[in-house]
């Protein structure tokens, strides 16, 4: 069993600084760094993945469009959508990228089935679907065995912006959300359902759960830790030279 830290960000988070925070965490982490899962909701934004094509953005309007470094095509993020950013060491977990994606899909589908929603993955396209409607999108990046980015689960949101794009590069793909099947639905209830399943399916111990009001935790926890390690290395190097 491995340790994991779960961070729940309390406010709507703009995409750009969150993306930069993920990159920083991944670049600085070491083999002993504890895995983290970040739960949050974004301010409205379209994100274009590495495989994204301009023709799949039909009309972004006043919603910003950001080209990012995750896999996949264009999608929408906004209030009422649960983002789970998975900052994991796949080598330590013994997971290939393919198995990682399948485990995410199966875990999300299992959580939705607990709400009576007949969700499942598809062999031909990443994500989780209810019939032919997509309820959860997955976009990842893996560097040196460390994953970042994650999944977007539609809970209780305005789905209208999806009509301004070809979601995930599929013309005419319909989107759905938990609220269409379970109404009312609360975001915290969805988290309480999905967290234990992620812990079980990925082999994690009970997590440390932290509520964050901003991205300052990255500076407080990780950059300081990295600086301390760098200082220790410099001290050792200097002592050897002396």
Curated annotation (Swiss-Prot):
Site (Lowers pKa of active site Cys): 134
Binding site for substrate: 70-77, 137-139, 150-152
Enzyme class: transferase
Key word Repeat present: no
Boundaries of every BPL/LPL catalytic domain copy: 31-206
Localization (cell): Cytoplasm
One example of a Gene Ontology biological process annotation: protein modification process
Signal sequence interval, chain numbering: none
Matches recorded under Gene3D superfamilies: Bira Bifunctional Protein, Domain 2
EC number: 2.3.1.181
Keywords assigned by UniProt, alphabetized: Acyltransferase, Cytoplasm, Transferase
Pathway: Protein modification; protein lipoylation via endogenous pathway; protein N(6)-(lipoyl)lysine from octanoyl-[acyl-carrier-protein]: step 1/2
Active-site annotation: 168 (acyl-thioester intermediate)
A GO molecular function held by the record: lipoyl(octanoyl) transferase activity
CDD domains: LipB
Listed PANTHER family: LIPOYLTRANSFERASE 2, MITOCHONDRIAL-RELATED, OCTANOYLTRANSFERASE
HAMAP family: LipB (MF_00013)
Note: In the reaction, the free carboxyl group of octanoic acid is attached via an amide linkage to the epsilon-amino group of a specific lysine residue of lipoyl domains of lipoate-dependent enzymes.
Family affiliation: Belongs to the LipB family.
Task performed by this protein: Catalyzes the transfer of endogenously produced octanoic acid from octanoyl-acyl-carrier-protein onto the lipoyl domains of lipoate-dependent enzymes. Lipoyl-ACP can also act as a substrate although octanoyl-ACP is likely to be the physiological substrate.
Protein name (Swiss-Prot/TrEMBL): Octanoyltransferase
Species in which this protein is naturally found: Coxiella burnetii (strain CbuK_Q154) (Coxiella burnetii (strain Q154))
